Swiss-Prot record:
GO terms for biological process: transmembrane transport. The keyword Calcium does not apply. It comes from Schizosaccharomyces pombe (strain 972 / ATCC 24843) (Fission yeast). The keyword Transmembrane helix applies. InterPro entries: MFS, MFS_dom, MFS_trans_sf. Keywords: Golgi apparatus, Membrane, Transmembrane, Transmembrane helix, Transport. One of its GO terms (molecular function) is transmembrane transporter activity. GO terms for cellular component: cell division site; cell tip; Golgi apparatus; membrane. This is Uncharacterized transporter C1773.15. Pfam families: MFS_1. It is a multi-pass membrane protein.
């Protein structure tokens, strides 16, 4: 049946209307188009994968590469050049996440108020410029200042990832995309490790005009700037503005997303959704889970090169020994991310991942043979699995744009707290074995297992309660009433487990 003239308006016009009147575009289109069959659904999903995911993956890779520069630099001369003594190096990682934590919540509101891809690209370019300028530092204080500023600029990126994935993919599709994004951290580690080793070899040949760690910052910074520019040009702020979709495809993408009963959200800030998030026990579970899994991450992300060197590997060999961890990370996270495509049991995956993490931590802490400890370091590449589960849960198990942004920011504060604490578990008085830090990894992973079980129990119980009540959205509700409903407000919403 042909549309009437009134119905046959363009998605572009509605996108503009949504932007001006703060209306939820997905709700406006919800009932305007036919049911999407499996073939069409696959086609739309594939097109999104081809046009949106690649640049998001590059952001993830370069972000990890940028954060890892301090780890590589720790054995490339930066501690000597900047006269670091005692526990001063610990504060390199802590200062980064201090800036990240303090500004994560206020800066994430920019994603709510302004175009998503434009804000994201601006911060990427800014952090790339700062990375490049880090080559100019000549004191410990100035280096700590740049790391703090870098943390501030990168605090926007993870909440942006959550929103990008939520506005382009359905709930059951989000876990793999989030896992694949984080898996690209592994490729970032491989690229950074390769560059570091190459610079180390050039240094041995006396072919460098400045310290290798300074050149490393220049290269990673310039790559990041270029990527930020491409984000600005290539990725649309929302599906209704996608230059790579036809008008009909834009309509269908929005219809496809609306089947989750979550819409694309309103750009209007809603205080009641923040209050609702504060009443949601999941937010606190996500927060403490982030702390538990981030403490080992914060420690090893900054000290793995030093610890590998202390196992007996020379500088160049220590840089190479970091690379298998990155390879395992990319392969394992990609494979683990595919499992929910068939079973949709992400909490089971989190528990399996944490069991492997616990094994990794135990090998690092208690194994005597060097090769067993090395195996523990390599298995650490699987450690982001619970982190992915948290991001995926926030993306798919919280509805309402303001609530989603707020819960993501609070979760990232927990992530920052853990990453701030992690480097501080490495005390110079315990060098070179750092046994206290290693034992803390084991304790944290045990705590994380109990929190994952609690999240699973909360979601299963609530789904059963809603199934028993068997309530539906009233047909008498106006479009205004249906806009930007939260998961608490929408009785048809079900939590993914």
């Amino acid at each position: 049946m042909e549309k009437t003239e009134e119905e046959n308006y363009s998605i572009k016009e509605l996108g503009e209307k949504g932007s001006d009147s703060q209306e939820d575009v997905a709700v406006i289109f919800a009932e305007k188009h036919p049911i999407i069959d499996k073939s069409l659904n696959r086609k739309l999903k594939l097109k999104t994968d081809l046009w949106v995911m690649p640049l998001l993956c590059l952001i993830s890779a370069f972000q990890y590469m940028d954060k890892s520069t301090s780890n590589y630099s720790s054995i490339m001369g930066i501690r000597t050049d900047l006269n670091m003594v005692g526990n001063q190096y610990n504060w390199v990682g802590t200062s980064f996440y201090l800036g990240f934590m303090v500004f994560s919540l206020p800066l994430s509101t920019l994603l709510q108020k302004f175009p998503l891809s434009k804000v994201t690209s601006a911060f990427i370019v800014a952090w790339g410029i700062l990375m490049t300028l880090t080559c100019l530092v000549h004191s410990y204080a100035s280096y700590i200042a740049t790391r703090t500023l870098l943390g501030i600029l990168e605090s926007v990126i993870t909440p942006a990832f959550v929103l990008f994935i939520a506005q382009w993919y359905r709930k059951e599709e989000q876990f793999f995309r989030m896992a694949f994004l984080v898996a690209w951290n592994g490729l970032g580690g491989l690229i950074g490790g390769s560059m570091s080793y190459g610079l180390y070899k050039r240094e041995l040949e006396n072919n460098l005009t400045m310290s290798p760690w300074r050149i490393l910052f220049i290269i990673t910074g310039l790559i990041t700037i270029i990527n930020g520019v491409f984000i600005f040009i290539h990725i649309p702020d929302e599906p209704s503005k996608a230059w790579f979709l036809s008008e009909k495809e834009k309509d269908l993408v929005l219809k496809r997303l609306d089947t989750d009963h979550a819409g694309l959200g309103s750009k209007k800030f809603k205080k009641y959704q923040i209050l609702e998030a504060c009443r949601d026990v999941r937010m606190y579970l996500y927060f403490f889970l982030q702390i538990a899994v981030a403490i080992p991450n914060g420690g090893l992300s900054n000290f793995s090169s030093i610890m590998l060197k202390n196992l007996g590997y020379v500088k160049g060999k220590a840089l190479l020994m970091n690379m298998p961890t990155s390879s395992i990370s990319f392969a394992a996270l990609t494979l683990f991310g595919l499992i929910p495509e068939f079973t949709n049991r992400r909490m089971d995956i989190a528990l399996v991942g944490l069991a492997i993490n616990l094994t990794s931590g135990s090998l690092i802490a208690f194994a005597k043979p060097t090769h067993a400890q090395l195996a523990g370091y390599w298995l650490f590449g699987i450690s982001p699995i619970p982190y992915i589960c948290i991001l995926s849960c926030i993306s798919s198990n919280s509805a309402g744009h303001t609530k989603k942004v707020f819960m993501s920011a609070v979760s990232m504060i927990g992530y920052c707290v853990g990453n701030m604490v992690g480097p501080q578990t490495f005390r110079s008085t315990q060098a070179p074995k750092y046994q206290g830090a290693k034992v803390s990894f084991v304790v944290c992973y045990c705590v994380a297992i109990f929190i994952i079980i609690a999240i699973y129990a909360v979601n299963v119980r609530e789904n059963r309660r809603r199934d028993e009540k068997n309530e539906y959205l009233s047909n008498e509700l106006s479009e205004e009433d249906k806009k930007d409903l939260t998961d608490f407000e929408n009785p048809e919403f079900r939590y993914s487990i």
